[in-house]
């Protein structure tokens, strides 16, 4: 479900300070039943990757269409100056020491800036947007609650036009499907676990 950004901003996450000047585009959350104690964002990311093939055909079709359009218009070519454009230089030594993976590690179309036990921030830079995906998890009485926050930094004057054009697809189809697929994959792996206190 799409939630009030204020709820997300109230969470004690590193992303709020790191991306203090980047607009927050969307925030979604999904309850995850069971799982037992000690689950982390790494566990959440693992079930999301495992559930990719179960994504609805319409969502897979939209991603394929976006990929083809990006190829035609040259939107998604690797940029040689990625490191210079990355927000990785905003990471403190403490952030780097705490991260479970090295900044710049590929994660699908994104690159991970950091992955803590309860929070991950990934970055995507192409010719249309400079986007960031914040994934976090917290315990609840019945299991866990996962948050997906999307930040977008315009790269030119057409970025907002582009984001506006794809907003209905993102909000009505893509994000709800991501949450449902995540919940389904979580239930398959952890649904039998005991609820968290």
Where are these regions (language model features)?
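A conserved amphipathic terminal alpha-helix motif
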Residues: 161-193, 197
């Amino acid at each position: 479900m799409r939630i009030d950004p204020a709820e997300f901003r109230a969470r004690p996450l590193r992303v709020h300070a790191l991306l203090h000047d980047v607009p927050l585009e969307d925030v979604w959350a999904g309850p995850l039943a069971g799982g037992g104690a000690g689950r982390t964002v790494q566990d959440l990311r693992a079930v999301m990757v495992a559930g990719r093939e179960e994504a609805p055909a319409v969502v897979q079709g939209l991603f394929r269409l976006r990929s083809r359009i990006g190829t035609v218009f040259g939107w998604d070519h690797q940029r040689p100056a990625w490191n210079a454009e990355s927000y990785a230089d905003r990471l403190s030594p403490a952030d780097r020491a705490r991260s479970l993976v090295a900044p710049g590690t590929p994660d699908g179309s994104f690159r991970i800036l950091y992955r803590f036990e309860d929070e991950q921030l990934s970055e995507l830079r192409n010719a249309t947007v400079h986007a960031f995906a914040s994934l976090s998890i917290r315990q609840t009485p019945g299991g866990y609650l996962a948050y997906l926050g999307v930040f977008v930094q315009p790269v030119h004057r057409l970025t907002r036009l582009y984001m506006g054009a794809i907003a209905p697809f993102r909000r009505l189809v893509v994000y709800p499907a991501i949450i449902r697929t995540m919940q389904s994959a979580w239930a398959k792996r952890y649904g039998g676990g005991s609820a968290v206190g």
